[in-house]
């Protein structure tokens, strides 16, 4: 929940993210190290609260900051203005509101992602050498490669880079320093179709519409209805394994 420190909260949260209006450089601000460490923990928690408020604001929920600070003070002092039952029901109400608002925002984002993806594909399709398949996949063949044609059971080894249409990179085997080995049947539809246009040693750019990628689901940080761009290099092919 939002009103207590979650498991993901870290006392080492990046203080540099806090928007400080000023930094006082007075000496002897703290009487001892425990005071200093307590202050640092407070800054880190405050940073987490600020980030949480900003995220909630984006989905249309704005809680009162002063009330939150009073709640923190009362929790520390033990002087609560609400019963435990009221607190419990309030947390459930807040959780329900957050889930509802998040659901609405995700639908809105998914619709916008789809529209922007179609626009990107329309522009990309006009580039020299780009071809479009009947399924809607766009591809640009950079190097055909040689050898056997790929089948669904083919085991392949590839290097690849995946980006969103805004240029955000979400995966890159080159940066990890090792290629990926898998079977063609286990990849997303856009890969399965697009990789059959190259052979061992080939290289291709795929622009994959949502229905050939992850569709309306958000997967590993990839937003729903995202059009995906992949640069793929086919390093090795093993058929009949």
UniProtKB/Swiss-Prot annotation:
Residues 153-241 form the PPIase FKBP-type domain. It catalyses: [protein]-peptidylproline (omega=180) = [protein]-peptidylproline (omega=0). Keywords: Isomerase, Rotamase. One of its GO terms (molecular function) is peptidyl-prolyl cis-trans isomerase activity. Coiled coil: none annotated. One of its GO terms (biological process) is protein folding. PROSITE patterns: FKBP_PPIASE. Its EC number is 5.2.1.8. It is an enzyme of class 5 (isomerase). Belongs to the FKBP-type PPIase family. PPIases accelerate the folding of proteins. It catalyzes the cis-trans isomerization of proline imidic peptide bonds in oligopeptides. This is FKBP-type peptidyl-prolyl cis-trans isomerase FkpA. The lineage of its organism: Bacteria, Pseudomonadati, Pseudomonadota, Gammaproteobacteria, Enterobacterales. The gene is fkpA.
